[in-house]
A protein has these predicted regions:
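Active-site environment of divalent metal-dependent phosphoester hydrolases
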Residues: 63-65, 80-84, 106-109, 120-123, ...
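Binuclear metal-ion centers of metallo-dependent hydrolases, dominated by the metallo-beta-lactamase
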Residues: 111-126, 201, 205-245
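Metallo-beta-lactamase
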Residues: 156-207, 215-221
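C-terminal motif of bacterial Sec signal peptides marking the signal peptidase cleavage site
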Residues: 13-15
Length: 245
């Protein structure tokens, strides 16, 4: 069995001149030749840097946010505490920051934000397009965690001609399985709240990204078997694993 490679490389400072702590990073080349940099914090919180713009996804937790570059956009998938934390948003956002969030989270901003529903599209700044994708559970006994009626969001970001699917908290429902033209996928892999390893494999085989980053994976009730996930996708998709428990 091929040993699991836990990528810890590319530890570098996120941003220049900010004296920010080092967090794991990874870099990819977009279709237009530009560079996309991912910075991984933990669980569902990560950042994307592209052409000098900084995008934060579900930023929460005890990190040195005040030392990070200010956000050009913050995307919030839903209102659960491990995805949305107003104190963190306030540390990252200034008056020029675009807040893009689901309708439940929007209530905390008194709707002074871009409220997204599944199917909605936002263009917070030149060079970034965000499409909202439904995120919900379908397994018996698990639907209350992320009900379809709440209209939580995943997002498909387009940067430099490259599509990045951030699924949010969801299982392998038909809306997820029907995503097309995805280059890079972030899927949650922890039960009982999101996908099992088998569900994540099914989604990757259906949407066929070039690169898959498992995130939001389990240390809760069931520890995610990341090694089994990587093995199941050998020859199907490149999988890069970062510490995103």
């Amino acid at each position: 069995m091929k040993k699991l490679l836990l990528i810890m490389g590319l530890l570098s400072l996120f941003g220049c001149g900010k004296k920010a702590p080092a967090y794991p990073q990874d870099k990819v080349v977009a279709k237009d030749g530009s560079e996309i940099v991912f910075t991984f914090f933990a669980h569902a919180s990560f950042a994307i840097e592209h052409n000098g713009k900084h995008i934060y996804i579900d930023p929460v937790g005890e990190f040195a946010w005040e030392k990070m570059p200010k956000a050009d956009a913050i995307l919030i998938t839903h209102s659960h505490y491990d995805h949305f934390e107003m104190a963190t948003v306030e540390k990252l956002a200034d008056e020029n920051c675009a807040i893009i969030c689901d309708k439940t989270s929007a209530e905390a901003f008194e709707h002074n934000c871009t409220t997204m529903w599944p199917g909605g599209i936002a263009k917070p700044f030149e060079g970034l397009t965000v499409k909202a994708v439904p995120a919900y559970n379908i397994s018996e006994g698990h639907t209350d965690f992320h009900p379809q009626t709440r209209e939580d969001c995943g997002y498909v970001l387009t940067l430099g001609g490259t599509t990045i699917y951030v699924a949010g908290d969801t299982e392998d429902n038909d809306d997820v399985l029907s995503q097309k033209d995805i280059d890079i996928a972030f899927l949650p892999v922890n039960q009982p709240y999101t996908m099992t390893v088998e569900q994540a494999v099914r989604v990757i085989k259906a949407i066929k990204p070039t690169l898959f980053y498992p995130y939001h994976y389990g240390q809760v009730e069931e520890k995610t078997d990341i090694e089994a996930l990587v093995k199941a996708l050998e020859g199907v998709c490149e999988v890069r694993v970062f510490p995103m428990e």
